[in-house]
Amino acid sequence: MEELDCEPAVTWIPGVNSKKKQMCFDWGPGEMLLCETSFNKTDKSEKVPSCPFIYIIRKDVDVYSQILRKLFNESHGIFVGLQRLEEELSGKSRKAQLVRVSKNYRSVIRACMEEMHQVAIAAKDPASGRQFSSQVSILSAMELIWNLCEILFIEVAPAGPLLLHLLDWVRLHVCEVDSLSADVLGSDHPSKHESFWNLVTVLVLQGRLDEARQMLSKEADASPSSAGMCRVLGDLMRTMPILSPGNTQTLTELELKWQHWREECERHLQDNTFAANPHLESLCKIMLGDEATLLEQKELMSNWYHFLVTRLLYSNPTVKPTDLHLYAQSSLDMFLGGESSPEPLDNILMAAFEFDIHQVIKECSIALSNWWFVAHLTDLLDHCRLLQSHNLYFGSNMREFLLLEYASGLFAHHSLWQLGVDYFDYCPELGRVSLELHIERIPLNTEQKALKVLRICEQRQMTEQVGSICKILAMKAVRNNRLGSALSWSIRAKDAAFATLVSDRFLRDYCERGCFSDLDLIDNLGPAMMLSDRLTFLGKYREFHRLYGEKRFGDAASLLLSLMTSQIAPRSFWMTLLTDALPLLEQKQVIFSAEQTYELMRCLEDLASRRPECGEPDAQRLQDDDIETTKVEMLRLALARNLARAIIREGSLEGS
């Protein structure tokens, strides 16, 4: 099934006047940057001499709420657990497991709502208090909707148990009766309390007949004239047939018993048993499901779905799921009475009673301020195999689309982005691509955060992103003159060009300071040394110094010569290498053979005689600078002396 959305509603941004100024904008992962240009909209060539304003518009502001972040964190664990549980779900246990997951989600919502309620009470700023109270109302509505969806779509309660679930639903979400009960029972004479009959009526409206009977017994004790009527009505409440969870009676048996009980209630009403007490008579009419009497108690029920469940309890307790929408629509119409229009919450609940899952999700997406609710509910319903046929026109299904939107919002937050990674992982169609796009936009403020991002990319074989992140960190390290860190990141990125650049910086620093920094890193390059010629040279040149320091002069001389003759050393560094050869040439023992000395002499003359090319001031300075000339002369003298010594030594060895 494909679905095309209608035109989105226009959102007005305070302070932005697009009629006077031309606007430009840029989308980010979780927000939009909007700014006024310097051009007048009516005449683009005329510049407006005023300072433009910049606006940052966030679409998912809820991620910045400290309390809601707990909701996101807790539900993330439930979500991941559900995805991993999918392979184990089968048979009868599947439904029980899914119901358990749904209740876990609801418990997280309720815990968050209760904490938000406490914060709202403690708020000193009236504006903050109103904001928190508004958020409490939203969370309450979310739990209300989720609970109903759990009953209808996940529990799939049949006729009979369906009403029991709906009664629990109403009792859970219409809880003013508890505070009312505490007030009445806490008084010296409960039956004389001004809210006594309101309390009894609400208890009957919610089907809490045992509690209602206890209240009537207090009235009977306090008013002997009403004792008989209270006893009769209490007996009717006690004998009302209700299908309890452990009861084995069939629906047919229940309907027969209920019909007999109803006839007895009608008989007492016709006999004017309660005529002397209007309150008791009203209660009897409620138990008969009299709609006019029920509507008189609108204020006590406060909403139409309470009216619906009470109406079903006393008129059709074995209602079938397929008939729910008829009762729901008529209850809504009767309760509103044409005086007001349905609210968004009413439309969502009505869609649920009509078993229109897609409409529920669509209405929730419009009404709620973030994607958390619809993303997790849709995912759960998808695991119930209720959404397989619903594909969107741009190549994804509804579950994946909503999860992608939710995860994108998480990436706008400095720490919640880590949760978003798992949501992308469980989107088989577009999750990988979306993760790649979003992870590149994470600001790498600290090395610790960068390592987290890098680990995530490496675990998912995101080679391109790994390279990109390593290059960014290498550049930052170079700018901060942390050459060891820069070299480490360039090696990790397998970036030969950048490794060459950093190696050059190491060599330049050596020329200026006469020693290497980050020796541990250079000494342990290992196979990474082969990433670039310059890095290889750096590693080998450091090895030359180590051999020299260990007085392994023969090995050091061979390595130095190989660095020059193999052309791996940059020509600009040849003079440094030849200068490093001087101490070896001056040793008492002959280190360089005649052949090796000839090679060094060739390199020196090649360096001294090569004509500098245009734009190479370093080579020009080689001939012009007196210091360099002195070095060349010293090297020639040392090489000549070493050659003579080597020839004599080699001749002596041959003669012997």
Curated annotation (Swiss-Prot):
Predominant subcellular localization, coarse grouping: nucleus
N6-acetyllysine found at: 92
CC per GO annotation: cytoplasm; kinetochore; nuclear envelope; nuclear membrane; nuclear pore outer ring; spindle
Residue positions where N-acetylmethionine is found in the record: 1
Residues bearing PTM Phosphoserine: 223
The keyword DNA damage is assigned to this record: no
Quaternary structure, from the entry: Component of the nuclear pore complex (NPC). Component of the NPC Nup107-160 subcomplex, consisting of at least NUP107, NUP98/Nup96, NUP160, NUP133, NUP85, NUP37, NUP43 and SEC13. Interacts with NUP160, NUP133 and SEC13. Interacts with NUP37, NUP107 and NUP43. Interacts with CCR2.
Family of this protein: Belongs to the nucleoporin Nup85 family.
Protein name in UniProt: Nuclear pore complex protein Nup85
